[in-house]
């Protein structure tokens, strides 16, 4: 919204609109799906200050910058535990949802400890939304563009990580305008030295426990060695998963 408002201010400053006209429009109540911004743009079109094609370009640019903004409105549990896993399975149907029923023949001891299964590879999916922690307001109002997240040194937070219970992690980073993907084996996670205790309970919160549950805070630069393009997710999981299984 910041970029759109700056563009509208630029258009207004170069238009013939008076301050009184602008103030009158801004004072009027706006209800969804209308907004003060759309009202001003419509007014500018009515005056011939901008063409419909220029309006359409503003709309296209706004949608491109905010194509994943709706994910910031999701409840934490829905986003963190449901959306990421379902999104990956939509991209690659080869991934099997890990349930007792689905794995009865190939992994009969399954007890909910990982999310997806791929030809013997156990996979855990985690997602994190990039947002400013220095301002107040809703999560959506603080959502970062990719460039903003990188420039701010945003640390992606992945929690409830159980490297002893899976072979490969798929981590999704959500920005307003793009999704980022990092694929790493559980061995690679341990080698980062970033895995810290989450202190969830006495059974999984200590490092010497067989099922240690931890969390990481890592910047995009720190995650760079594990970055993959969306179309390469399946191949990366195969490569890292099979390498670990075959050890």
Question: Could you say what each language-model-derived stretch is?
Answer:
Residues 122-124:
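Short hydrophobic-acidic sequence motifs that mark active-site Asp/Glu residues
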């Amino acid at each position: 919204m910041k970029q759109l408002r700056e563009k509208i201010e630029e258009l207004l400053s170069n238009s013939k609109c008076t301050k009184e006209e602008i103030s009158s429009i801004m004072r009027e109540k706006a209800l969804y799906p209308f907004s003060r911004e759309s009202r001003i743009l419509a007014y500018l079109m009515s005056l011939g200050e901008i063409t419909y094609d220029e309006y359409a370009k503003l709309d296209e640019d706004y949608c491109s910058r905010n194509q994943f903004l709706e994910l910031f409105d999701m409840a934490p549990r829905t986003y963190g535990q449901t959306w990421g896993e379902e999104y990956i399975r939509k991209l690659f149907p080869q991934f099997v949802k890990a349930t007792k029923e689905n794995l009865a023949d190939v992994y009969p001891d399954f007890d909910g400890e990982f999310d997806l299964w791929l030809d013997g590879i156990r996979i855990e999916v985690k997602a994190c939304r990039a947002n400013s922690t220095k301002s107040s307001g809703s999560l959506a109002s603080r959502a970062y563009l990719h460039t903003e997240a990188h420039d701010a040194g945003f640390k992606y937070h992945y929690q409830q990580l159980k490297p002893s219970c899976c072979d490969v992690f798929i981590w999704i980073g959500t920005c307003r305008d793009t999704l980022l993907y990092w694929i790493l084996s559980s061995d690679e996670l341990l080698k980062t030295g970033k895995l810290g205790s989450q202190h969830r309970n006495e059974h999984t919160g200590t490092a010497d426990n067989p099922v240690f549950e931890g969390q990481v805070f890592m910047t995009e630069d720190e995650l760079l060695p594990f970055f993959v393009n969306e179309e390469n997710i399946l191949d990366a999981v195969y490569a890292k998963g099979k390498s670990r299984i075959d050890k």
